[in-house]
């Protein structure tokens, strides 16, 4: 009932419940229903016309328009009632919503959410998160599907008077995905994708030449997870691999191969009121000395910092290894909630070939507590408040972040609401502010926020 903000459920689920699925009702007595085996094959063809501003002298843009024909096949096959295979050849993502424009002045890559249906379906089983919350580390994951079909890594090497036509994305030659969950609680997720070698076409004024800007690449993702004891125990693992067919130019800054893997364990206690979770991950990248030197100098680790005394920049390396993990204990039911968490990534951990991360060489420790009241009383309908204390340090013992965060929200009986929050950060050294230079002290700061909302029903 929208005007009263009320909902009716067949099986009532308490507001303070530690979950939803395990509290849902069960329906019995439906017999003689035979599910249809799925077999959908969808060929497609696309005629594309692109217009842009004319550019005099540029043979690729002097007409102000470009035409393209494309085609491919998508297929969905029901292996069993609970297991589905998706296949695609030269998929068409032309109708997918475009990413928003972003001005990024940081040293870190912008994270974009996935919008392509092929990768969205079954996304939960192919995920292996090694971050926490919705902050900078919240997106850290061993699999970031936007890597497949991404904008090419390389750029055309042009001389004066030369013009280039460079592709904006990498063609996915073919991909296969198997996802599902068996009756005995085994979840499976496998993806194999092959992306094409992409070349930039260059007009030299006297002819046309081609330069490779993205190599032929094979991506593999494998994820399994098993439920035990009516879903109170979960044990899983993940493995990813990236293998590239590199030429000499691309081999100077791209990894020849990259592998990551992990194990995860989750245990619920006391009717799911308490949860313990541990995720462990490893990474190994290999390539030329120049490529691994680029990795050591990247914004994720800055091994070349002059005051870096716990890691060493080695220009002779041809591989880099590291590990990461998260240990978490959480109370997630009742009025009072609590979380203790520690996350780490060693200096050599690197997941950006097929995953996503911003920084390695860090340890984040957090203690969070919150209180929630749902029973109306006086002028309010409900309220909640919470706060956390956090400390960030690197593996050299430098405290690179420390502070306290809080937030609160109150909903009133007239359906207005108000909220407040803030952050107190102490002064601390930054290892990345000078982007490879020495550490620099950042002064402490206090930030506050507050707001209110009128009756949302009007």
Model-predicted regions and their roles:
Residues 1-41:
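Acidic/polar low-complexity flexible segments
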Residues 19-34, 79-83, 122-132, 177, ...:
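Outer-membrane beta-barrel proteins
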Residues 33-54, 116, 120, 138-149, ...:
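Transmembrane beta-strand segments of Gram-negative outer membrane beta-barrel proteins
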Residues 84-148, 175-188, 347:
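Outer membrane beta-barrel
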Residues 171-173, 179, 258, 269-458:
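Exposed, low-structure sequence patches enriched in small/polar residues
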């Amino acid at each position: 009932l929208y005007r009263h903000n009320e909902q009716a459920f067949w099986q009532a689920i308490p507001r303070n419940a530690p979950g939803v699925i395990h509290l849902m009702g069960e329906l019995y007595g439906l017999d003689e229903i035979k599910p249809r085996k799925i077999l959908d094959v969808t060929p497609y063809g696309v005629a594309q016309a692109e217009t842009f501003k004319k550019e005099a002298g540029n043979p690729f843009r002097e007409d102000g328009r470009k035409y393209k024909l494309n085609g491919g096949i998508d297929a969905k096959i029901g292996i069993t009632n609970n297991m589905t295979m998706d296949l695609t050849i030269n998929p068409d993502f032309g109708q997918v919503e475009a990413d928003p424009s972003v001005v990024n002045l940081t040293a870190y890559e912008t994270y974009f959410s996935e919008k392509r249906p092929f990768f969205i379906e079954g996304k939960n089983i192919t995920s292996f998160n090694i971050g926490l919350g919705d902050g900078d580390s919240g997106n850290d994951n061993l699999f970031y599907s936007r890597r497949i079909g991404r904008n090419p890594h390389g750029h055309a090497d042009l001389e004066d008077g030369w013009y280039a036509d460079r592709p904006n994305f990498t063609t996915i030659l073919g991909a296969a995905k198997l996802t599902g969950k068996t009756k005995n609680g085994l979840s499976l997720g496998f993806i194999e994708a092959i992306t094409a070698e992409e070349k930039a076409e260059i007009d030299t004024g006297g002819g046309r030449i081609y330069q490779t800007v993205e190599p032929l690449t094979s991506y593999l993702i494998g994820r399994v997870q098993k439920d035990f004891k009516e879903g109170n125990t979960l044990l899983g693992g993940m493995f990813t691999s990236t293998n590239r067919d590199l030429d000499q130019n691309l081999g100077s800054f791209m990894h020849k191969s990259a592998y990551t893997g992990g194990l995860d364990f989750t245990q619920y206690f006391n009717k799911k009121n308490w949860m313990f979770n541990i995720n462990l991950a490893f990474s190994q990248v290999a390539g030329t000395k120049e490529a691994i030197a680029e990795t050591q100098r990247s914004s994720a680790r800055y091994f070349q910092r002059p005051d870096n005394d716990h890691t060493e920049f080695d220009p002779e390396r041809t591989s880099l290894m590291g590990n990461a993990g998260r240990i978490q204990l959480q109370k997630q039911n009742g009025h009072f909630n609590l979380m203790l968490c520690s996350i780490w990534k060693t200096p050599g951990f690197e997941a950006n070939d097929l995953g996503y991360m911003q920084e390695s060489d860090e340890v984040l420790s957090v203690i969070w507590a919150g209180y929630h009241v749902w029973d109306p009383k006086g002028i309010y309908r409900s309220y909640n408040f919470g706060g956390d204390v956090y400390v960030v340090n690197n593996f050299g013992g430098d405290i690179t972040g420390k502070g306290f965060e809080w937030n609160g929200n109150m909903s009133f009986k007239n359906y207005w609401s108000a909220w407040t929050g803030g952050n107190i950060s102490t002064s601390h050294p930054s290892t990345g502010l000078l982007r490879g230079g020495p550490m620099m002290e950042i002064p402490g700061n206090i930030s506050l926020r507050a707001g209110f909302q009128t009756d949302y029903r009007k």
